[in-house]
Amino acid sequence: DRIGFVQRVYDDGSIKSERGNVGNAVIYGIESLVDFNLNELFFKNNDINFNYFINFSLIESEYTKSMEIGVEGKKVEFVPSVNIKTGLKYGYKNFSFNTQLSFISDQYTDSSNANEGNLSGVIGVIPSYKILDISSSYKSKKYGIEIGINNVLNNFYFTRRATGYPGPGIIPSPPRNYYITLELKI
C-alpha cells in the first residue's frame, strides 16, 4: 500500500487533492558512490588532497495495482528517476576548496502524473534542475573558517508543492546565497 495524493472531482466541478491509499507500487533502482583519490595518481604529495566523486541513483517506480482510475502504470510521486551529485575536493595543507554539481530529474507530485499544474499549484510536474555549490575553508588546531556559495548559477527551481500553509502552491527554493562559518576549539 502506498500513501499519496489522488485528484477527486466533486459535484460542483471542483477538483481537490486528497491524501490516501493510492495502491500497490514497485520501486527499485541502483545507487552508487565512487570517490577517486587523484593525489595518488598524479601528485604523490602528502600535503595535497585531490578527490573526484560522483554519487548517482537510477530509480524506477510504478503503481502496479490501484482502485483509483488512471493510476496503474503511472510513476510514483516524488521519485525522480535520476539523482546525480558530482564534484571535486582539493586541499593543500590546512586549506580546502570544494565544488559540487547536483542534478535531479523531473518528478510528479500526484499519482495521476499530471504534467500541467492547476491554478492552486498543488499538482503538476516538478521540473528537473541543476545546482552548483562551492566552498572553501581553512582549519588549524585551534580555529577554522569556511565560506561558501550555494546555487552559484542562481537557478530558479523548486522541490515541492505545498498543499497547506504557506500554500497551496509552489514553494521556491533559495536563490544564490552565501554563508560563513567560524569555528573555535576551546
Identify the meaning behind each predicted range.
Residues 3-4, 22, 76, 157:
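Short clusters of hydrophobic/aromatic residues that line enzyme substrate/ligand-binding pockets
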Residues 81-85, 131-133, 175-179:
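Transmembrane beta-barrel architecture of outer membranes
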Residues 88, 134-137:
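Short, basic/aromatic-rich helical patch in the C-terminal catalytic core of site-specific tyrosine
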